[in-house]
């Protein structure tokens, strides 16, 4: 028996206001306008665009590109919610449930912050993608015709409109090249395994949408192994996209099934903050087809079973506390239940990190985004001490305080798309813990980098203020003003920085403490290499006995401080200070 092939899952991503939702609406419209009678194109949380509908919509372009009869995928399943969170939640062990991504970019302004973030997330999950250079209708002088393929449209434009388009695409190609991505307009790409295709589109007029769907089909067949799209006739596997309370139904979960079959009465295993849990399916809800949807208020129907690939609303006892991004497994044989609970528990444990190692604390709204953030932070060299889903807690503040003791730059909680309880905010402020929150990962990270740099600088300054700086001086012949109690002599600073309060050493042995430094009869805070100054030395020292005119003296530096200078803070010493320190340590060795 031939195994069923499912449609690839497609996620639309990009910066705010680039036209993601409008483009999705335009794509979904093709499935409505060119659907087969009775076909359910709308699922819970996603929309099916069948390949026959694409062929009807893009007929002339299909023929021009010689694709008729060559596409084996049944269609596309577009995730209805565009953006970062939806993509992050489409997670599974070893990769992503998403098979393809469309990165939507405003052709008039190029790649922006969230676009870059989306791009890095797509790459981190290894998902093939296509770039939709949207807002083609905004190109100066462009003449639009509704739903016209881009390849036909570009041939019918004035030269100046084409020139403007080429200029904007060129800028986008350069931006992508700076991120290490080789891209070009799709009709110029010769090797799709080496170059990312850019498809100019207009979500307003529909121009280029046919091209986008055909390029997606080509990319899917080029990069998605057929086995990945094969669906087993066994217990369902899926991912929770959203959990909410529905009047009359209680807590429900909107689930995307990517394999197997889910039936009414099935035991399912999923996860909450406290680990894996089981529930029993009471009802499965799907949208009605357009023909059945006679009453606008009556859009849904209960079904007995659902086969992958599908988006379905699951009503079950025990869904309270289940978190978006959690895996979902159906269990048909009770003997398989312990293994399913263990498997889901282990998968969640891989994301929820808690260890004694140094690092920041991370909080996110879903398991999917949490996993993405941890992956991103590690790539940026920021360790994570603890990560979890939901608002920050008292325990997080305690953990951050412990982290700060080891490294002040790790005394922070990064809160992605979650509210911070007022009492936790107050406790963090009084404990010196920084809470950085936001909805854009790059901005949270940039703010953390700025803050941690300030903390590191302040910490280093505090440490350096406690360390004795190296210096090398010579007693000037003929400039002994007082021989003892205290000795007052003229000296030249040969290297380093001399400050009051330091102890001087000769041949590695302490000889006295510098009480004051004067230049031309006035006290000064320090003297540097090349300065000639008078200093007073207190201690059991007599000029002519312990020290003599012409002697070279060094600032005495305790062994622990010398080690810190050499192995941790050497970059904060001037070259002459390093030389003074190294010479001083040699005199210590000789006297030892």
Curated annotation (Swiss-Prot):
It comes from Pyrobaculum calidifontis (strain DSM 21063 / JCM 11548 / VA1). It comes from the Archaea. Residues 80-83 are annotated as: G3. One of its GO terms (molecular function) is GTPase activity. This is Probable translation initiation factor IF-2. Residues 202-204 are annotated as: G5. Coiled coil: none annotated. PROSITE patterns: G_TR_2 (PS51722). It holds the Pfam family IF-2.
